[in-house]
């Protein structure tokens, strides 16, 4: 790929994430990429909406040089859920049990742009996200703001950057009408 000029967009930028949807990678049967964007996804209700604590989703992406001409890309998705309970144990177990085969995630950023994380044009679905860590704590006092919280980390290393969804699919995700997402009701 040749270097091309890059034009900066003068527009409002909003930090943070608005949504997180996670799928076992085997449940997503087809992903189509057109001009560097996800243009089609097949997998009936493959992605499950994960309702997290407000402002707790954080997606970090980075890359670094490997050897003379290679790069490794890293994705880390952190989120928290407050109040440990039985349903939370079900999520914990599902993420742990699904990690050997891996996950794909849709992260909707603060600008309402959705990204497919755990999939890249180079690796396809061979370098998915896995549960890196989960840890919880009750806190010691009633006044601890971060007490009784469980924190999760999904992460991967792969050979390419996460890809954005095209305008049509992005609109469906934001409207809550994407056929491949099982939304909360």
Segments (PLM) and residue ranges:
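Solvent-exposed edge beta-strands and adjacent loop segments
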Residues: 2-78, 126-144
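Generic "edge-of-domain/loop-turn" microfeature
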Residues: 27, 38, 84-86, 112, ...
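Oligomerization/assembly interface segments of phage tail-like spikes and tubes
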Residues: 64-89, 145-160
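A general structural signal for short secondary-structure junctions and capping/turn motifs
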Residues: 68-70, 94-97, 107, 142-146
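Composition- and surface-driven signal marking solvent-exposed, interaction-prone regions
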Residues: 92-94, 168-169
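Short, acidic/charged, Gly/Pro-enriched secondary-structure junctions
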Residues: 93-121
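Mixed-charge, glycine-accented linear interaction segment located at domain edges/termini
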Residues: 124-185
């Amino acid at each position: 790929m040749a270097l091309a000029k890059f034009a900066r967009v003068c527009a409002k930028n909003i930090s943070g994430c608005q949504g997180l949807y996670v799928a076992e990678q085997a449940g997503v049967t087809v992903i189509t990429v057109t001009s560097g964007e996800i243009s089609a996804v097949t997998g009936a209700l493959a992605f499950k909406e994960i309702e997290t604590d407000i402002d707790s989703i954080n997606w970090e992406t980075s890359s670094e040089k490997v050897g003379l001409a290679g790069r490794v890309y890293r994705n880390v998705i952190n989120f928290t859920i407050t109040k440990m309970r039985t349903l939370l144990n079900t999520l914990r177990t599902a993420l742990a049990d699904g990690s050997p085969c891996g996950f794909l995630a849709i992260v909707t950023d603060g600008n309402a742009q959705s990204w497919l994380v755990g999939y890249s044009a180079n690796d396809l679905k061979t370098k998915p996200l896995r549960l890196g860590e989960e840890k919880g704590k009750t806190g010691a006092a009633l006044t601890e703001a971060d007490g009784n919280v469980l924190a999760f980390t999904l992460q991967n290393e792969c050979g390419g950057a996460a890809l954005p969804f095209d305008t049509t699919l992005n609109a469906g995700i934001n409207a809550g009408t994407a056929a491949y997402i099982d939304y909360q009701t």
